[in-house]
From Swiss-Prot:
Keywords for this protein: Developmental protein, Nucleus, Repeat, Transcription, Transcription regulation, WD repeat
CDD domains, A to Z: WD40
Region of interest (Disordered), ranges: 143-228
Predominant localisation class: nucleus
Compositional bias segments (type: Polar residues): 202-221
Region called CCN domain, residue ranges: 153-196
Source species: Caenorhabditis elegans
Gene Ontology terms for molecular function: RNA polymerase II-specific DNA-binding transcription factor binding; transcription corepressor activity
Name of the protein: Transcription factor unc-37
Pfam family, any one: TLE_N
Length: 612
């Protein structure tokens, strides 16, 4: 009897567990259906707005046509002779039945001057949903999405980024920046830009993404402009558009379709990428002069070759740090690599045989420096003699370490929750620290005192770099701005505003260009002397680190799309792209431009030899 009773209880428990499982599954399905319904409602509202705009424009055109006919018939025709009146009336009747071919258009309902291959272009004709190719349908969806028009729809993906590694941009109650690092999941396959996330994760550009493997930066900024990624327009490679069509058609499209092309440079870049091709691949570099419309960049013949221009990388060492590597640097003589993770900096020995050998070397570190009390390290700066290391991260202090004795010699107080980036003056006397509260602190390293503050960023200061002569400091922030500071006067002398948070920044050694990596997947190269800039679109997720070669001829950028891209300075011709297995969080280039090190969410750093 007792055994039967226990068996009955076990069966009831099993049935209850099974029912709970089904209930949870149904609840999950209901949430997914609700999300899909919400997305469908947003899409419906977008299409309804487009339809209403087109109907309104059609009514306007009909009214204008009616008034013109009345004016001709009532005011002009009576002044003509009888023969001319008859000819005028006949011409008016002929105009009513004129075919598109007679009007000089290559396709029905296209405006004059539009390329024949552009039939069905967004917002240019009332009957555009009919007869559109799949590629054009996708292009329409890109421009009609709520993201493009400043909405907060959830239909956009990261344009091919690993969905398990989206940046987590949270908004904590305390108003401070929050850094969170979790382990990487297995990378997922790339998804099309503009498609809904199939695994339930939010876009990299959303305010509350989850599952990040990268140290994420949470901000108290509520007004985040969300940008639709440029990458992922599948099928556009097959479209035979003319690259040099009349730019005034952008204004016609903006007026006819209700889309804000002229005030959204990213929408302009997407349109330019769709219709302008360079060689056999879609355009990925765009030149913008004085805030104008982005145009595909024309590269010189030697853009991807020549002395000092790399052709690729060869893996030489794998440095298994054991934690997510948020900072990495190479010593001046290439004999050491320093990697920063959670609570420690590890030092790795690099031998000439490691670089010249044919096999990938994997060995333990020669030393480990315990620092920042189990907080993640975000920046390491090595003195030129290789004996002193500055360490900053998710702590209120910046640590100074003597590497000869492997002891900490100084803690510099920042009065902030975190320090995201460090830079030193050329004479190594001054230290500059980017802080979570938006300030940039200046320390006298030798006298061990704070000597100044550069206030200006309205949100966390995330990155900085010095000009080669040390007179100018460039900083980027989560307030969507890049600022230039005159260090002699210690005041802001220039400011550049963007549509996205700035995550990384680097100054070209010739002091003519500054490259900026952003949360919206773009790299922008700004001229320090003129009004032109280049916009580069190869990344499929946010750009986390950026570094110029010491020659100034090229620079590299890394991101949450697991990619390392090498670009020609300044116009961004792609030299090569390398994919790792996880988000690439940090990078450095050796002083002689022969080595590159990357730190990743795979809890390791990788040392590469640069091939020329």
């Amino acid at each position: 009897m007792k055994a039967s009773y226990l068996e009955t209880l076990d069966r009831i428990k099993d049935e209850h567990a099974e029912m709970s499982k089904h209930v949870n599954q149904q609840r999950s399905d209901i949430e997914k259906v609700a999300l899909e319904k919400e997305n469908m409602n947003r899409s419906y509202m977008t299409y309804a707005e487009v339809s209403n705009t087109l109907r309104s424009d059609l009514r306007k055109a009909e009214e204008i046509n009616k008034r013109l006919q009345e004016f001709i018939m009532q005011s002009l025709a009576p002044q003509l002779s009888q023969d001319n009146q008859a000819n005028c009336l006949a011409a008016l009747e002929a105009f009513k039945t004129a075919s598109p071919r007679e009007n000089g258009n290559g396709a029905p309902a296209l405006p004059p001057g539009f390329p024949p291959g552009a039939a069905g272009m967004l917002g240019m004709m009332p009957n555009m949903p009919f007869g559109m190719s799949p590629a054009m349908s996708q292009l329409f969806n890109q421009f009609a999405s709520p993201h493009v028009n400043g909405g907060d729809g959830a239909g956009g993906s990261s344009g091919g980024a690993s969905e398990a590694k989206k940046a987590k941009l949270e908004d904590p109650d305390d108003g401070e920046l929050e850094i969170d690092v979790t382990n990487d999941d297995h990378p997922s396959t790339a998804s099309n830009g503009g498609a809904a996330n199939k695994n339930g994760r939010d876009s990299t550009n959303s305010v509350a993404s989850s599952g990040a493997s990268t140290p994420s930066i949470a901000s108290n900024s509520r007004a985040r402009q969300q940008q639709q990624p440029l990458a992922g327009l599948q099928g556009l490679e097959q479209m035979n558009f003319l690259a040099g069509f009349n730019p005034n058609l952008l204004r016609q499209a903006s007026a006819a379709g209700g889309f804000n092309f002229l005030n959204d440079p990213h929408a302009q870049a997407r349109l330019a990428a769709a219709i302008g091709q360079i060689g056999s691949r879609p355009a990925y570099s765009f030149k913008i002069v004085d805030g104008g419309v982005p145009t595909p960049t024309s590269f010189p013949p030697d853009a991807q070759k020549g002395p000092g221009i790399p052709t690729g990388l060869k893996k030489k060492m794998e440095l298994n740090h054991g934690e997510v590597v948020c900072a990495a640097t190479i010593s001046r003589d290439n004999s050491r690599v320093y990697t920063g993770g959670k609570g420690c900096v590890k030092i790795w020995d690099v031998k000439e045989s490691d670089i010249s050998g044919a096999t990938v070397v994997n060995r333990p570190p020669i030393a480990s420096l315990d620092c920042l009390k189990e907080n993640y390290i975000r920046s390491c700066k090595l003195f030129e003699d290789g004996n002193t290391l500055l360490i900053g991260g998710e702590a209120s202090t910046v640590a100074l370490w003597d590497l000869t004795t492997e002891t900490k010699t100084l803690d510099l107080e920042t009065d902030s929750q975190a320090c995201y980036a460090l830079a030193m003056s050329p004479d190594e006397k001054l230290l500059f620290a980017c802080l979570a509260d938006g300030n940039i602190l200046i320390y006298d390293i030798h006298n061990k005192v704070k000597v100044g503050t550069l206030p200006g960023h309205q949100d966390g200061a995330s990155c900085l770099d010095l000009s080669k002569d040390g007179t100018k400091l460039w900083s980027g922030g989560l307030d969507n701005s890049v600022r230039c500071w005159d260090l002699a006067q210690r005041k802001e002398v220039a400011k550049h505003d963007f549509a996205s948070q700035v995550f990384s920044l680097g100054c070209c050694p010739n002091d003519e260009w500054v490259a900026v990596g952003m949360e919206n997947n773009y790299v922008e190269v700004l001229s320090t002397t003129g009004k032109e800039k280049y916009q580069l679109t190869q990344h499929e997720s946010c750009v986390l680190s950026l570094k110029f070669a010491h020659s100034g001829k090229f620079f590299i950028s890394t991101g949450k799309d697991n990619a390392l891209n090498a670009w020609r300075t300044p116009y961004g011709a792609s030299l090569f792209q390398l994919k790792e297995n996880s988000s690439v969080l940090s990078c450095d280039i050796s002083f002689d431009d022969s080595l590159i090190v990357t730190g990743s969410g795979e809890k390791k750093a990788t040392l590469y030899a640069v091939e020329y």
